[in-house]
């Protein structure tokens, strides 16, 4: 049942691909605004490739103390390494006594193993000591479910064609309303059932289809604006958010991507800049 005054907010902390230099790597936050700045009101999805995640959180007005759940889609550096910095500040906060409660890290078995190894190699022993005590690393499985922000979440294996196992998720954030994310590869037919009829879909689009010969996204397991929009149209997605893009012309990215996408997609198409937010 929808709570009085309830608002779920989606903030795109980063919108760029792995080697982006003019915007941050693709990642976003989901917040239950009804909880204000109370502990546990922020769910972080991926964290980019470095401590720039701390800058993006600060610029977005998101207190890292409010993050109690982090999901990392796969082990590529532009998604995983920023999570080490999240673990760093959380564990340090616990050590100093100013971080309340537990922290839950979600990812497939490859992600969890990598995060565990990096944390024990790179954090001080007094920080990594919280892993397994108040910081819990959860290896998710295909069609596995949990509760995050008090809402049901289903994880799914995207059947990656790339070099790393990758998972997406679908969250029912309000009765009958679903937000889904398919990671940084095009959604495949094996997972259409998780996304069909979704209220919001966060999906990669490396470049415009008009620029496919310039960027050649398919060999690196990415797709185009037109392809992502055609999939969203086929699945009757209400709102499509494109991210994980090239960053060669950010000043015109939005208008050019929108023009191509709207030719095949009749829903609400969004091509956000870094730090752009949406009320769901």
Model-derived features with residue positions:
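Conserved beta-strand hairpin/beta-sheet module of binuclear metal-dependent hydrolase folds
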Residues: 4-60, 165-183
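Divalent metal-coordination and catalytic microenvironments
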Residues: 10, 46, 57, 74, ...
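Active-site neighborhood of phospho(di)ester-bond hydrolases with catalytic His/Asp-centered motifs
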Residues: 44-48, 67-75, 108, 179-183, ...
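Cap/insert and terminal regions of metallo-dependent hydrolase folds
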Residues: 186-275
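Metallo-beta-lactamase
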Residues: 99-165, 274
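Active-site-proximal loop/helix segment associated with metal-binding centers of metalloenzymes
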Residues: 20-23, 139-194, 198-210
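Active-site metal-binding motif and surrounding structural segment of the metallo-beta-lactamase
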Residues: 51-103
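Short gly/ser/thr-rich secondary-structure transition/capping motifs
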Residues: 52-54, 134-138, 180-186, 222
